Amino acid sequence: MLGQGLIFISLAFVAHALEIPISCAVSHNEQTEIFPHGTIDIPEMTFRPSDSQIDWSNLSHSDFVQCGVYEDSTNTWLAGASKYKIDEIKTLPKVPRDHYIILCDSSESNEIAKFTQVVHSFDFSSDSESAVVEQLHPSSPIPILTTAVRKKGSRPSKPQKEKQGNKQGSKTEESPNVDEDELESEPEEKTFFQKYGLYLIPILFLIIMSGNNANQQAANTAK
């Protein structure tokens, strides 16, 4: 769900660093553009955005965006990144805001070696555009990521049902609640007399009448 998509990022490479670089990628037509998004400072637990930020107004409705830790040397994300569809983000009344939760094994934030993961999501519950960085250790309560805020009176769009083709020979799944007696049976093939019987009756009648008239005329001629 939008606002709850999580990106789990391994932080083993920052064991001796004081910052976590965050990148964002915009995908469109199988082409992806990756640019620096900002840096998480440790132990200050703050986010410093880079000069190049996402311009949501210039993105197409078919684009996708994802953020996380990207390794330039291997051209890969260090962990699976959830994608957000721009079409859903641009219809929301508020500007998306970065929300980072840093997971660690200890309550001491200055022990960088204790940090294990970063959870990233887009937060739409606040008017503020500044990113939120939180720390979560074993004794901390589980954070609740807010969902996307919709305009008053709006309804979530329902997925459209796929149109069923009318091509002959296409197979359809039988509904479990439909009785077999209610299913239409295929029509039986008619015999020759069933198809043309109504036409043969008057023809036979005319043949018989013609034969009787011929016999009667022959009898009159013989007299």
From Swiss-Prot:
Q: Where in the cell is it found?
A: Endoplasmic reticulum membrane
Biological process terms from the Gene Ontology for this record are: protein insertion into ER membrane
Q: Which UniProt keywords apply?
A: Endoplasmic reticulum, Glycoprotein, Membrane, Signal, Transmembrane, Transmembrane helix
Task: Enumerate composition-biased segments (Basic and acidic residues).
Answer: 159-174
* Signal peptide range: 1-17
Q: Where is this region: Disordered?
A: 149-188
Q: Does the keyword Endoplasmic reticulum apply?
A: yes
Where does it mainly reside? Answer: endoplasmic reticulum
Q: What is this protein called?
A: Uncharacterized protein C19D5.02c
Native species:
Schizosaccharomyces pombe (strain 972 / ATCC 24843)
